[in-house]
Every structure is written in structure tokens, then in C-alpha cells.
Amino acid sequence: MTVTANQVLRPRGPQIERLTDTRAKVVIEPLERGYGHTLGNALRRVLLSSIPGFAITEVEIDGVLHEYTTVEGLQEDVLEVLLNLKDVAIRMHSGDSATLSLSKQGPGVVTAADIKVDHNVEILNGDHVICHLTKDTAVNMRLKIERGFGYQPAAARRRPDEETRAIGRLVLDASFSPVRRVAYAVEAARVEQRTDLDKLVIDIETNGTIDAEEAVRTAADILSDQLSVFGDFTHRDRGAAKPANNGVDPVLLRPIDDLELTVRSANCLKAESIYYIGDLIQKTEVELLKTPNLGKKSLTEIKEVLAQRGLSLGMKLENWPPAGVASHGMLG
């Protein structure tokens, strides 16, 4: 148990209890009284609204002009098929969009496993039923996959210059969040003679494209990033206080693992002693392409991930590395 400068208890590291492959409980304790609900509610909201994921956003089905078309030999109506497609759990290793296809000859059951994927795309719930073919007929689909977060209705994603939708292109309401359910409970905790402390228990279930504990960590990172803007405000008011790490943006001190790059890209960077985001952004494209086993595809992935955070390659940093950052990739 440690105490911060203002005497507020700092909890121990989270304890993880895996319940299933997609569900886990995360326990954080001890917390000051009231902090359980403060942190639990904030984390729950971010988990449900802001964790990025992938979803099917557009569908084209041979012979289908609109959502209300009747297809002979198809047990479900088209609307039900579209609803089933929204529940396909998809993970992409790089990039923000892809186009997949599905072809199946009936009679029989059409499942998510029938979707043709490449090495960059995974279907996590291959047994998920999309539709049933009752006759000797075929179904052919083209599916557009996109990256996003939260829930986005089809109307919100329609381009402003798109006056009319292409006939046969069915736009879906997309739920990008990989988090299916989150609940939290606050229980009593005790440390030595203090019995008025909180224990936060977060029960989280995902669609399998992300681990429950990874989702909680990402939510905590998002909250930390949002709250970090108040740090400068506080320092200005205190006057005498000095920013840590010689004024270096805390984002640059985060390990490259926080970028969620593919394993190949991350290992290539670490092999070149690039451990922090601050190390990475100072490299140029030419320098990175000289890295063994790091090709143009990995370079594109790195540039896209940095751009999402308002960063780019080839940036110049003064006083890097700051005090406390060791060359072996650990904060000293």
C-alpha cells in the first residue's frame, strides 16, 4: 500500500479472474471511500462507448435491391440477415477497412465461417448463423468491414455528397464496440485498521476480438489521456510546480505496445531499441524501412496508428530521452 503526495490511497495492481474466454472480472483495491463508484462509472461508460473495433458496415447481396426484397430459397427475410451480419465478430491485424465475400450453395446453414478472409482478417465466432438456405440455391454477398468505435447509425455514416444510395448497396447500423456487457460493483475493503475503503469489481464481457483485461486497460488509457490536460492547468496555478520529465508530453513516454501494432511490427521496432512512442516518432520513413523484416505494409500501419494520435514520423524532440527513461525500455 502506498500513499500519494496528497495522502490519497493508491490501489494495488488489478487482479484478473478469467470466467470464460470472453468474460473476466477485474478487481481493484483498496480505494478511498467513494472512489469505487467514481472510477467504476467512468470506466463503464468509456468501455461501452469508446473502445475501437471492427464491424460490417455495408452489404451487397446478388439479386437484392433493398432491405425488403424477398429471396427465394432463403428462410429469413433480408432484414433478419442484415441483423445477423451485425453480430459477426471481426478482428483486423492492420488497416482500417477491407472488403470480404461470402458464397454458399444450398440447401444448408450459412455461418460466419463461410466468409472468405485473408491473413489480415479473423472471424472469431465462425459458428454464428447468418441465414438458412432451404433450396438448391446460392447466396453471394460482398461485405465491407470498417474500423470505428461506439454505435453509428447508417444515416450518420452516409457521405454528405451522396445524394442517392447505390441500388443494391445496403448500409448497416454499425456497433463497432467489442465490449458486449459491463457491470461493476463496489464492495467493502479493509487495510490494517481502516474499514471504510472500497473494492471495485468490474465484470466485463467482450465479443472475443479483445481480451477483457485489455479492454479495461484501453479504457483507463483513454481516461488518463483526457484527464492529462488538467495537469498543465494545475501546474500553472501552483506556479512553483515543475512538469515532470522536462515538459515531455506523457504520450511520448508510453511504450510502443500501447499503439497495438501487429506482433511483427512491434518486434521489429524493439529489435532496433525503439521502446517508446517518443523513440518512434523521431525515426524517418527511410530509417524504418532499413529495419530488418519491416516492410512497406508495416510502415503504413505505423503511420496510420501515429496519425490517429496526431503524431507522425520524422518529428524532432529536444531533451530526449528525458531523465528516468532507460535505453532498455523501462522507466527508471
Swiss-Prot record:
GO CC list: cytoplasm; DNA-directed RNA polymerase complex
Annotated stretches, region: Alpha N-terminal domain (alpha-NTD): 1-234
Lineage top rank: taxon: Bacteria
EC number from the UniProt entry: 2.7.7.6
Positions of region (Alpha C-terminal domain (alpha-CTD)): 248-332
Pfam family, one: RNA_pol_A_CTD
GO terms for MF: DNA binding; DNA-directed RNA polymerase activity; protein dimerization activity
GO biological process, one term: DNA-templated transcription
Keyword Nucleotidyltransferase: yes
Alphabetical UniProt keywords: DNA-directed RNA polymerase, Nucleotidyltransferase, Transcription, Transferase
Catalytically driven reaction(s): RNA(n) + a ribonucleoside 5'-triphosphate = RNA(n+1) + diphosphate
Xref: NCBIfam families: PRK05182.1-2, PRK05182.2-5, rpoA
Record-linked HAMAP family: RNApol_bact_RpoA
Task performed by this protein: DNA-dependent RNA polymerase catalyzes the transcription of DNA into RNA using the four ribonucleoside triphosphates as substrates.
Family affiliation: Belongs to the RNA polymerase alpha chain family.
Subunit and partners: Homodimer. The RNAP catalytic core consists of 2 alpha, 1 beta, 1 beta' and 1 omega subunit. When a sigma factor is associated with the core the holoenzyme is formed, which can initiate transcription.
Record remark on domains: The N-terminal domain is essential for RNAP assembly and basal transcription, whereas the C-terminal domain is involved in interaction with transcriptional regulators and with upstream promoter elements.
Name by which UniProt lists this protein: DNA-directed RNA polymerase subunit alpha
Organism: Stenotrophomonas maltophilia (strain R551-3)
